[in-house]
Amino acid sequence: MAQSTLYSRVLGTGSYLPPDRVTNQQLTDRLAKEGIETSDEWIVARTGIHARHFAAPDVTTSDLALEASRRAIEAAGVDPQSIDLIIVATSTPDFVFPSTACLLQNKLGIKNGGAAFDVQAVCSGFAYAMATADSFIRSGQHRTALIVGAETFSRILDFKDRTTCVLFGDGAGAVILSASEEPGVLGSALHADGSYSNILCTPGNVNRGVIDGSVFLHMDGQAVFKLAVNVLEKVAIEALAKANLAPEQIDWLIPHQANIRIMTSTCRKLGLPQERMVVTVDQHGNTSAASIPLALDAAVRDGRIQRGQHVLIEGVGGGFTWGASVFRF
């Protein structure tokens, strides 16, 4: 008897934003006390961001991941003990090691000895994690994966640099991906170019347990913008080709929620109407690896994304890294 082809498909989604919502005006007032000038109008015009969420000092990335994971598990209707693969995409882990994924596995009470590890591709992290989990499931090594993007970027922001501190926020999003004979993930593409590592980085490093250098995020905004708009269209087309789909067959585009100008540029280049693009950056800012699953969960829960529809996710981030995946929800 011929063995059936194995696919992976999305069973459920979840997300979590910490309760401390900081509006542009609140952030502007905070910065003004430090002698730094900005305004709600300046931030919105350049980024489309109106607010972001910051985690409390005693809340870690794994805590945010836990809340999002619980919601995804509930939505998927799976037994947590059936999850035999956990991948957390993050650039702000709780510790140097162990991985945030291992900490999350323990917090969820999963005792089955399944694999758990982190992926670090900054804002492309969720695209990398989803493609990785899909490959593991298709190979037959694992059956049910929990994929999480979670960040506490507020911990690495320099609040004396108005060009970066207004952009980022904290949050987490999660997806349950499970083995299926029915096609789900249809195509993925991942890329990196380390020669651009200096345009978006946190240059501090761990040396014998002590952080040397700056622990704050540094970004060349113009260079990032130029590179992002160039690679995002290409990687989207590549993923679509692997899925045997044309851009017009995509029901929903979920780009990394970084900057509304980058997002709309990519949407326009793909020939998609703006109404098919999911936008949540206005409400939570750039949450790095968490942004794509946050937006995905929002659109699933408000009824925009329906079963059977084609979804294209794409991200670009420090490294420089970029990636995209196409799936049938």
Swiss-Prot record:
Record bears the keyword Transcription:
no
Pathway linked to the protein: Lipid metabolism; fatty acid biosynthesis
Gene Ontology terms, cellular component aspect?
A: cytoplasm
InterPro entries reported for this sequence: ACP_syn_III_C (IPR013747), ACP_syn_III_N (IPR013751), FabH (IPR004655), Thiolase-like (IPR016039)
Molecular-function GO terms, alphabetical: 3-oxoacyl-[acyl-carrier-protein] synthase activity; beta-ketoacyl-acyl-carrier-protein synthase III activity
Q: What is its main location?
A: cytoplasm
State the PANTHER family in the record: 3-OXOACYL-[ACYL-CARRIER-PROTEIN] SYNTHASE 3, BETA-KETOACYL-[ACYL-CARRIER-PROTEIN] SYNTHASE III
Task: State what protein this is by name.
Answer: Beta-ketoacyl-[acyl-carrier-protein] synthase III
Task: Name its species.
Answer: Burkholderia orbicola (strain AU 1054)
